[in-house]
UniProtKB/Swiss-Prot annotation:
Belongs to the TDD superfamily. TSR3 family. Keywords: Cytoplasm, Ribosome biogenesis, rRNA processing, S-adenosyl-L-methionine, Transferase. NCBIfam families: PRK02287.1 (NF002621). GO terms for biological process: enzyme-directed rRNA pseudouridine synthesis. It is found in: Cytoplasm. One of its GO terms (molecular function) is 18S rRNA aminocarboxypropyltransferase activity. The lineage of its organism: Archaea, Methanobacteriati, Thermoplasmatota, Thermoplasmata, Thermoplasmatales. It holds the Pfam family Ribo_biogen_C. It comes from the Archaea. It catalyses: an N(1)-methylpseudouridine in rRNA + S-adenosyl-L-methionine = N(1)-methyl-N(3)-[(3S)-3-amino-3-carboxypropyl]pseudouridine in rRNA + S-methyl-5'-thioadenosine + H(+). This is 16S rRNA aminocarboxypropyltransferase.
Amino acid sequence: MTGIYYLYLRQDDPKKATMRKLERFGLAKRVDIKGVGLKLVLTPYADIFLSREDAVLYEKYGLCVIEGSWNKIDSIKSLKFRIERRLPALLAANPVNYGKIGILSSVEATAAALYIIGYWDTAYALLSKFSWGLNFIKLNENPLNEYSTADRSEIKKIEESYFG
């Protein structure tokens, strides 16, 4: 499993940082802001939805998620990346934000992105490292399946059909 990166902002308890746990398993690699480069970056401030069409970007450059605190989300608003995408709405399964729309842990966001671009096995492998992880797929199975087969132009309509 290669091509999964994270930008660690040191905003949370390091013991709860999901991407750091994945790094300990050799499933993700930390990068600094200069190391982001052309990687496909997940950010809630992107104008463009992630879709299956982005699989080629993942394959070529990798995927980078921002590991930070939702309580300090405004601190990343000013960060701009060359290739940035946002996830469509999904429900969190992590114990801190269970059932909240869009308040995903970094591993949930990473797994959702991988699922949407067609890397289901990798998404499951990442989530399996957390006791609550696979529940994320169960909780979001229908929207994830629809997002993963849709063109970018259809994502907003699918999101609205599930989450209003």
